[in-house]
Amino acid sequence: MKPSSPSRSKGHAKARRKTREELNQEARDRKRQKKRRGHAPGSRAAGGNNTSGSKGQNAPKDPRIGSKTPIPLGVTEKVTKQHKPKSEKPMLSPQAELELLETDERLDALLERLEAGETLSAEEQSWVDAKLDRIDELMQKLGLSYDDDEEEEEDEKQEDMMRLLRGN
């Protein structure tokens, strides 16, 4: 009798041997991959790892490289920039400013409210006072007064009376 050999179970199937064609194809693939190893042709002169052009395009450029701003080579004096003064309101002639104040809608509305007997807030009242004071100043500069119209009417009435008395 033969000594019994360990029994092989069906679970451990024998590995299939590759055919000569399959072995040759695998060898060709390995050789092709081995040929591709190393640097790309011309990489020594071109200077680097840029195997494909897309690599350089995706990388963000360093802003410090290639600045086009001129750099002074000699010692130069610093040019101090003069700050422009903030634009102030253009100076109007007293006559133009007076006309603007007389046609001011907000001032008219607040004065009408005052005449109607309403009380204004402290802020509104101070604004009205400031505007009325400015109108007084301008009228004094221009030599006008509130009573000019009334005086003219009185002067005309007196002239009319004088004409009547003279008998013209």
Curated annotation (Swiss-Prot):
NCBIfam families: PRK05244.1-1 (NF003560)
Coiled-coil region: none
GO terms of molecular function: GTPase activator activity
InterPro entries found in the cross-reference section: YihI
Subunit structure comment from the entry: Interacts with Der.
Ranges of compositional bias, category Acidic residues: 146-158
Protein name (database record): Der GTPase-activating protein YihI
Chain segments carrying region Disordered: 1-99, 143-168
Composition skew (Polar residues), residue ranges: 48-57
Function: A GTPase-activating protein (GAP) that modifies Der/EngA GTPase function. May play a role in ribosome biogenesis.
